[in-house]
């Protein structure tokens, strides 16, 4: 395979949605794992990971924010293999914190690969894990005569991996008719520990499922989709059955369009069945599901859906909306669209390894963290691994599903959960912050009550209350932006100067906020950023945009205030603006290429 370093890139259509909609509970992280027939050696696994990342440099990315969109940027971070230490599919992307978007862990005989959906989809994750497992097994067993093999095309390049296939196959001419979506039945019964993700796995025979599917004249996915809808229906009340059971079924678009991309490239269909108005027999449900798949799974319909999604993203007005506004709209849209589906069924298909490596592997498995009840499956050899994930009480639905399988002559074997005792994320920092916020609120409230009742001649109560509010705002910015010191400094500059303007206005406007505070804070912040970047030896791409923002703020705002004659004593303000101007000139002269690249990244639409 041709090796070349990855470059910064725009997010694909699906990644733009995931970057906006992910949160602490809905992490949009999924786990693909391989269970071996022997205990994992962490040192060898680390060496195998180092080799794998050379093949897939597109994974060495961090998520950054631009003015209009997020983007992915190469970084110097390297993945470190760890023993499994937290709940499966926990958050990988933490706002403002520079972290990789994937993680490799191990536990006993299991190698786990977890990845944020912004980085890749199920197909990309499968290829990465296969390469990792292959490298690991070769390093362990080469002394026994195991030969190295290639799993990827020799002529595949990094450019192939980075192709945005959504854009490649987008066509303005493709349109699909609008369909009115009915609200689907929702699973709402929360577990007592509903904040935790519950994973229940079982294994069945691939051949048994295929045999029964062929007898019925349908594909494995159609067969299992019908059973899944029936299992959900059995737990619905008469009132609940007025709404249809609708499953979201992801579709790998590489089966319709030629693509070697490691980025997201999938679509979905939504088979739904109303058990009140339609025949409830298994034969009728299976017939409906088969016809639905045959109708929807066509290249033309997939292409039309791609065009529909891209048309919204590429709308000339919507593209120019600020990122934060886009995020709010995407989050609202994602929340609304949840009403249209009951659960998710994702078939990752068969994982294939070279014959010489098969004897060392027990099975592969996959599951994901979503706000919905989800069934994921993948197969290896004759083992079909099912994984139900949910934060709701779905035990009865799972029981129904396996009972229905048994009625079709397919036995299942439960997989005993093997997870270490996880380190719960520390809530101590947030607890301290909440106590601090409570004390600040208490002091401000006490000062206002004192002011109202005693009317002190020197209004020290209001000054105290204002000082506490100012201190709380500054420390809150420091707390929530603690992962990025340079962004923290920029926010402190922006909010700090606004607070000073307010204080100046409330005390009779003596112009000290614009004459002194604004230029001094701007130059001080710019200097602090420069020193911090040098001391921490940050790459240019990590600090340049913040220095440009600080210098621009220290030049443009004082300039406007000078022109509007708001500044009474212009000397300090003019010298501050001069320093910021010279800094920007120096950036253009000495860091012109980096400056241009940062502007492209942060202003791309």
Residue spans for each PLM region:
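Acyl-thioester-dependent acyl-group transfer interface
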Residues: 1-67, 77-102, 234-415
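Central hydrophobic cores of alpha-helical transmembrane segments
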Residues: 226, 489-496, 544-554
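Membrane-interface helix-boundary motifs at transmembrane edges
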Residues: 425-427, 476-488, 535-545
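Hydrophobic alpha-helical transmembrane segments and adjacent interfacial helices
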Residues: 439-453, 470-478, 493-510, 526-533, ...
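Membrane-helix interface and helix-disruption motif detector
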Residues: 444-466, 481-486, 502-521, 539-542, ...
């Amino acid at each position: 395979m041709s090796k070349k370093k990855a470059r910064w890139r725009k997010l694909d259509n699906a990644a733009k949605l995931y970057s906006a909609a992910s949160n602490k509970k809905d992490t949009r992280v999924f786990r693909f794992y391989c269970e071996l027939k022997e205990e994992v050696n962490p040192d060898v696994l680390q060496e195998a990971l180092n080799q794998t990342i050379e093949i897939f440099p597109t994974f060495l990315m961090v998520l950054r924010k631009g003015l209009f969109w997020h983007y992915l940027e190469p970084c110097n971070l390297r993945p470190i293999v760890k023993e499994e230490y937290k709940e499966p599919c926990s958050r990988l992307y933490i706002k403002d914190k520079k972290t990789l978007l994937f993680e490799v862990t191990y536990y006993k005989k299991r190698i786990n690969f977890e990845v944020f959906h912004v980085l890749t989809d199920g197909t990309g994750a499968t290829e990465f894990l296969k390469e990792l497992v292959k490298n690991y097994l070769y390093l362990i067993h080469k002394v026994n005569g195991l030969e190295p093999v290639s799993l990827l095309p020799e002529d595949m390049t990094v450019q192939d991996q980075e192709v945005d296939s959504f854009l490649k196959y987008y066509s303005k001419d493709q349109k699909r008719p609008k369909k009115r979506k009915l609200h689907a039945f929702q699973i709402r019964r929360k577990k007592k520990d509903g904040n935790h993700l519950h994973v229940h796995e079982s294994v069945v025979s691939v051949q048994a499922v295929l045999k029964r599917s062929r007898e019925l004249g349908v594909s494995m996915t159609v067969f299992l989709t019908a059973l899944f809808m029936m299992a959900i229906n059995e737990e619905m009340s008469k009132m609940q059955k007025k709404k249809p059971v609708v499953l979201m079924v992801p579709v790998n678009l590489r089966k319709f369009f030629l693509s070697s991309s490691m980025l997201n490239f999938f679509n979905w269909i939504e088979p739904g069945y109303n058990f009140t108005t339609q025949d409830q027999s298994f034969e009728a449900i299976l017939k409906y599901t088969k016809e639905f798949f045959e109708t929807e799974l066509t290249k033309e319909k997939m292409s039309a859906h791609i065009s529909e999604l891209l048309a919204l993203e590429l709308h000339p007005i919507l593209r120019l909306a600020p990122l934060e506004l886009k995020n709010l709209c995407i989050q609202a849209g994602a929340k609304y669209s949840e009403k249209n589906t009951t659960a998710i069924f994702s078939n990752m298909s068969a994982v294939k390894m070279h014959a010489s490596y098969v004897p060392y592997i027990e099975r592969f498995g996959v599951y994901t963290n979503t706000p919905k009840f989800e069934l994921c499956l993948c197969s290896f050899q004759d083992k079909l691994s099912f994984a139900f994930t949910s934060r709701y009480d779905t035990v009865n639905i799972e029981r129904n599903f396996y009972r229905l399988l048994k009625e079709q002559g397919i036995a299942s074997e439960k997989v005993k959960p093997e997870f270490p005792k996880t380190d719960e994320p520390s809530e101590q920092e947030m607890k301290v912050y909440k106590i601090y916020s409570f004390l600040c609120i208490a002091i401000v409230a006490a000062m206002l009550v004192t002011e109202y009742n005693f009317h002190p001649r020197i209004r020290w109560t209001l000054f105290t209350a204002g000082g506490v509010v100012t201190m709380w705002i500054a420390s809150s910015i420091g707390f929530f932006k603690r992962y990025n010191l340079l962004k923290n400094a920029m926010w402190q500059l922006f909010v700090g100067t606004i607070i000073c303007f307010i204080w100046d206005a409330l005390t009779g406007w003596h112009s000290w906020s614009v004459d002194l505070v604004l230029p001094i804070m701007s130059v001080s912040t710019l200097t602090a950023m420069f020193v911090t970047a040098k001391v921490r030896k940050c790459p240019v791409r990590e600090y340049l945009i913040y220095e440009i923002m600080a210098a621009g703020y220290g030049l443009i705002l004082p300039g406007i205030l000078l022109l509007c004659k708001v500044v009474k004593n212009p000397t300090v303000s003019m010298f501050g603006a001069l320093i910021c101007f010279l800094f920007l000139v120096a950036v253009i002269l000495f860091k012109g290429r980096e400056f241009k690249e940062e502007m492209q990244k942060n202003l791309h639409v």
